[in-house]
């Protein structure tokens, strides 16, 4: 997704606290729903052979490593910082109120909205970097265990996608193409191979 780099990232929009939280977490999974699994491709577990083949997943017995993690404390702190910023600005500056403080927001065109988007892009990029480091560490272990190179083992990334992001996208709405800010909380965009 986004070739591993969200455009629009601006480190100046990220607090020192967020940076400090992320410094020693690069290359780590975290807890909760984050995981790393070593899986075996079974012929009876492939539901769409054409699609699986497009991703290079076609050999029964093929070993696949799947993992899920993000930007860790860095992204969490970015969200926390801007949630508080939005809560302060909403009533007076934007005339907005929400029933749940977790829904705090700011207009995208506002300084607060633009700063949040720039910081969120930094968090998305941190998540790409984190997963890249984890992938490298997994590859090193496989190479050491099997005594073969990455190329000999056929190790490669199949798919990398972020969740909990907002992206500027073009979509058709009421017969007209429009640029929209699409927020996906705990969800990802389904992109073709």
Located regions from the model:
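Domain-length cofactor-binding catalytic modules of enzymes
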Residues: 1-193
């Amino acid at each position: 997704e986004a070739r591993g780099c969200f455009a629009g990232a601006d480190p100046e929009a990220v607090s020192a606290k967020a940076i400090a939280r992320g410094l020693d977490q690069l290359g780590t999974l975290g807890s909760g729903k984050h995981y790393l699994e070593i899986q075996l491709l079974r012929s009876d577990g492939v539901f769409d052979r054409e699609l699986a083949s497009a991703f290079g997943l076609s050999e029964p017995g093929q070993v696949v490593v799947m993992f899920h993690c993000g930007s860790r404390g860095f992204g969490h702190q970015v969200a926390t910082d801007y949630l508080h910023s939005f809560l302060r600005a909403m009533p007076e500056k934007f005339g907005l109120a929400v029933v749940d403080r977790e829904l705090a927001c700011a207009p995208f065109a506002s300084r607060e909205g633009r700063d949040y988007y720039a910081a969120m892009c930094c968090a998305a990029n941190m998540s790409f970097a984190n997963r890249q480091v984890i992938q490298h560490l997994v590859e090193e272990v496989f190479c050491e265990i099997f005594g073969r190179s990455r190329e000999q083992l056929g190790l490669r990334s199949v798919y990398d996608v972020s969740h909990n992001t907002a992206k500027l996208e073009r979509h058709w709405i009421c017969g007209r193409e429009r640029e929209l800010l699409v927020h996906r909380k705990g969800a990802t965009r389904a992109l073709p191979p």
